[in-house]
């Protein structure tokens, strides 16, 4: 769990939060202050110095990581809400007859007395690995920006938008991804603390 929390924080730390006053920025950092993502209500923030002496390639790499973690957090947060409200896939998860709803929600499904068997966890890791290495990336090399995984197959009308609309939608995704990262982190913490919270219910 500590690893998951660290990954969520590291993925977003270089891109947002209030600008610090009284400290001179380097010329490179000043160039990044106008990048997409340095936007209200938080502005530009690099508390860990991850952009110190960084070039555009490193910035793009960090932005790619942030976008990817934001998308994962979206799915994770939605999954928490759905399963904790009693909605699960039908049928059995294995040949032993264990149903999807027979396993606990949240982190308890990964680590605990009633967790998913190791073979099941290995399947999850393998599936995520395949997505990471072969699917969720710019396969064709034609991506317009970090996180553009259309690969000539998915569009959803993106090319019909003007540049202002594209920037707006990308900014919205960044902000929502940041909120989702903090949201799933909050749920993970509350799960360890116990108790009940609105919408999600009993942790």
From Swiss-Prot:
Keywords: Chlorophyll, Chloroplast, Chromophore, Light-harvesting polypeptide, Membrane, Photosynthesis, Photosystem II, Plastid, Thylakoid, Transit peptide, Transmembrane. One of its GO terms (cellular component) is photosystem II. Signal peptide: none annotated. The keyword Plastid applies. InterPro entries: Chloro_AB-bd_pln, Chloroa_b-bind. It is found in: Plastid, Chloroplast thylakoid membrane. Transmembrane segments: none annotated. Residues 1-30 form a transit peptide. One of its GO terms (molecular function) is chlorophyll binding. The LHC complex of chromophytic algae is composed of fucoxanthin, chlorophyll A and C bound non-covalently by fucoxanthin chlorophyll proteins (FCPs). The ratio of pigments in this LHC is; fucoxanthin: chlorophyll C: chlorophyll A; (0.6-1): (0.1-0.3): (1). Belongs to the fucoxanthin chlorophyll protein family. This is Fucoxanthin-chlorophyll a-c binding protein, chloroplastic. It comes from Trieres chinensis (Marine centric diatom).
